Amino acid sequence: TYLKLADAPWTFLLESVQGGEKWGRYSIIGLPSRERIEVRGFTVRHIVDGEQQGASEVEDPLAWIERFQSRFKVPDLDDQPRFDGGLVGYFGYDTIRYIEPKLRTALAAEKPDPIGVPDILLMVCDDLVVFDNLSGRLQLWTHADPETPHAYDNAVERLETLELKLRSATFNTLSPGTGR
């Protein structure tokens, strides 16, 4: 299923666990994200469909992320996993500089970055495949912004496309030596 739907950049697989030892009820595939946030130092970049929408020097990147996230409202649904999409990614080790004032200036000095990864990288996850390992059910989820024209129709179209891909008998195979 992952290879059929998520064989692309900006995807992920989350497995739930109970007590750190038992297989959990849900497995969640995050499908290719169109939108992401990258933070390097105190510069926040907002990227949509691979194009930078803006870059801002900010005093507090965590506050910027919190404001960005506040625009998303998703209802709580009974008997569904608590995770329903939103921001997925990582906060790197040096994120502490945004929290601890004593480290702000000490870490602000430019340090070598041999691997070139952002301090924070978050994908906006709109489309999900949710496996309920208890019931054996698979669900396709998508988010639609009611403020966006034709959002509902676009969401239905995305879900129908995902269903067709799932029903197809073929999937992309990983090519040895190419990393894909």
Language model regions located:
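Extended accessory regions or peripheral subdomains of proteins
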Residues: 1-11, 16-57, 93-180
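Short, charge-rich binding segments
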Residues: 28-29, 75-82, 121
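FAD-binding glycine-rich core of flavoenzymes that anchor FAD
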Residues: 60-81
